[in-house]
Regions:
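Catalytic alpha-helical scaffold of carbohydrate-active enzymes acting on polysaccharides/glycoconjugates
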Residues: 2-151, 156-195, 220-243, 251-288
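Positively charged, amphipathic and often flexible ligand-engagement surfaces
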Residues: 184, 196-218, 238
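Short, local alpha-helical segments
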Residues: 206-210, 242-249
Length: 288
């Protein structure tokens, strides 16, 4: 049975999220990913993906880890915002300073597969192989950051019907693959418990830029507009607002300008909880 099937559906008035703290819980998810240079990956120019190597797209993606992320860290430091790092475990080996600096800032870390090569997507693999992949990623992150990995986001949000049960069995507390609600909700697992913490494909730079084709300014406007609606609704019933970002997209200067504007708008409001997936999970488990 799917983990999502038969999960309780709530009317908005029936759920509260940190209502004594804020009207909106803003969760910036920062996807920090590694793409092997000999395998096609997310591309700004798809026409060269078949080349090996593909310096055009590999270099564009690598800009995120070399430059874009640090621009984002500086901004988030300025406004007191912590990220929830969706981490490919290969980053630990390839870019150890990234893990050191974000961990120093007490950012949250959730598992996001080995790397973002299609060969490491979870869809279609057997349970034994999936358990090996998930378990290996969790152990690598826990060793690198020195604490339990509470959350998981499957690479490209690809998972199997076994994924939720494997995660719960391995001690993971929340999953971000389902984008179905403005609030956390429980998922059905065979043993233990697993919570769905909000994630989004709406306020997500990859589909916004690569699939929908919005402008940099429009993406900033989308963040502001989403916040304004949820902030108004949060006066009666607090909401979660995930913002899902990739360093090689919004870390580019022309896009970063509008991300900075949007984050400044959020930070200018009172009764806003700038938080992480870990903290939302902890709050929900304590108060549900």
């Amino acid at each position: 049975m799917s983990a999502l099937r038969l999960c309780p559906h709530h009317r908005p008035s029936e759920v509260q999220v940190a209502e004594e703290i804020a009207r909106v819980a803003v969760i910036p998810y920062i996807n920090i990913e590694h793409f092997p240079n000999n395998i096609p990956g997310t591309a700004i120019i798809p026409g060269t993906q078949q080349f090996n190597p593909d310096p055009l797209n590999y270099g564009w993606r690598d800009y995120g880890n070399r430059v874009g992320l640090w621009r984002m860290i500086e901004l988030m430091d300025q406004i007191g915002m912590r990220g929830t790092v969706c981490l490919n475990s290969d980053i630990i080996r390839e870019y150890p300073r990234i893990v050191e600096e974000t961990n120093k800032r007490k950012w949250a870390f959730i598992g996001h597969g080995i790397n973002n090569a299609p060969a490491n997507f979870l869809s279609g693999i057997d349970e034994k192989k999936e358990r090996e992949i998930v378990g290996g990623v969790l152990k690598a992150i826990e060793k690198a950051v020195g604490r339990k990995t509470k959350g998981w986001l499957s690479p490209f949000l690809t998972h199997t019907n076994n994924t939720p049960n494997i995660l719960a069995d391995l001690g993971v507390e929340y999953l971000c693959d389902y984008t179905a609600d403005d609030h956390p909700f429980p998922l059905n697992v065979k043993k233990g418990s697993l919570v769905s913490v909000p994630y989004t494909v709406e306020l997500n730079d990859i589909p916004a830029f690569a699939n929908v084709g919005v402008s940099s300014e429009a993406f900033g406007d989308m963040i502001v507009d989403q916040f304004d609606v949820l902030y108004d609704e949060g006066a009666d019933n607090a909401r979660c607002m995930p913002i899902c970002l990739h360093t090689f997209w919004v870390g580019q200067p022309n896009k970063f300008k509008h991300l900075k504007r949007a984050f400044g708008h959020i930070a200018s409001h009172k009764d806003v909880w700038l938080t992480t997936g870990d903290d939302v999970n902890d709050w929900y488990r304590k108060n549900r």
